[in-house]
Amino acid sequence: MTHASILILAGEASGDYHAAALVRDIKQRSPHIRILGIGGEKLADAGMELLHHYREINMIGLSGGLATIRNIIAAYRTMKRELRSGRHHLFIPVDFPDVNMRLCRVARTAGLRVCYYISPQVWAWRRGRVRKLAKLVDRMMTIFPFEQELYREACVDAYFVGHTIVRDIPEPIDRAAARKQLNIGDNEYVVALLPGSRPPEVRRMLPMMCEAAEIFAAQFSDTRFVLPLAGGHLEPLVRDIASNYQVNVKLIHGEAASVMAAADCGLVCSGTATLQAALTCMPHAVVYKVDPLTWWIGRRIVEEDVHLAIANMLAIEAEKQGGPIKEIQDAGFQIRCRECGRPLFVPELLQKSATPEELAQWLVSFRTNESLRRAMVRGFHQIRAMLAPPKNGPTAAEIVLGLLESHPSREQ
């Protein structure tokens, strides 16, 4: 369709990141397609017309206030008006299910095709949403392979299209180049500290990490600790916390993937950074801690078989064929979930087990046990292969363009 029009809603930074890659691919194949909606700088740079910035709709909470609520209502009304305008052919909601599932209903009523990109994490909590989505979408494009079968069992036309991060962190990992870029010596032993991207996370995680670094440095004095800042606004907080510990931490603005590529091992707060750590082949432990009430509520909402490290979710899926967990076991190690006892690939130190002593012990293991290191690296290569786009399947852009071709034409 030469003059087709697509609406997109990406309500947070991760959605902006994934959707921008999709828009670039669509524009490369069909530059005349008009794409507009809600997103951020990455989507705008990729060629999407911004109706609103995602910051206007994802800041509700104690700090949001009435102004933010008004912005959310205005953005929602804008999308409803556009969906009902008759000017567009396809709606692509990107994650952000609380808003996007409502807009899917509007799109369906208006006669638009719906192609959901980045599945809501129904495998983690509220699995009943799968049945609702089956009635709302024409296609579901997933970024984790285990999601495709979950949706197809519910009669959703789902396709695993690969994870964007695989394209952004290419193989092979050039550790020497990463170190040169960051001005780190070839012979230095480097530990990466990634305490999260939000101030509350940093306040909880960084003191533990710094104390673990002190313990480790007392045994291995040649260690260099490096911390990539997720944003410049975090620097005063990070410096203030780090100043309380007898350890020198080199701060680097951004460049998280480069820091992990340069590091020998690391400690990582849960989130996207755990995938970056896996794809840069950095042995690491995942650490997370919240207040007891939040943890208690979370354990009753989230499914029992869900783990914070996506690498563990993927490794469990591959367990029957061997996979990353077997690599660890063959190296003589047993990494288990403290909650359910299940064998894991990457250690997860959560709540009571998230102590400086436990963190330091894993850093020691990564440094002193070469068999463990090699097993983890082999497992990371398998994780990458699982996240890569299927060789014989359609790409996300091809799925979108196929839906446009099958849509009844409208006058522009």
State each model region's role:
Residues 1-412:
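Nucleotide-activated sugar donor-binding and catalytic core shared by glycosyltransferases
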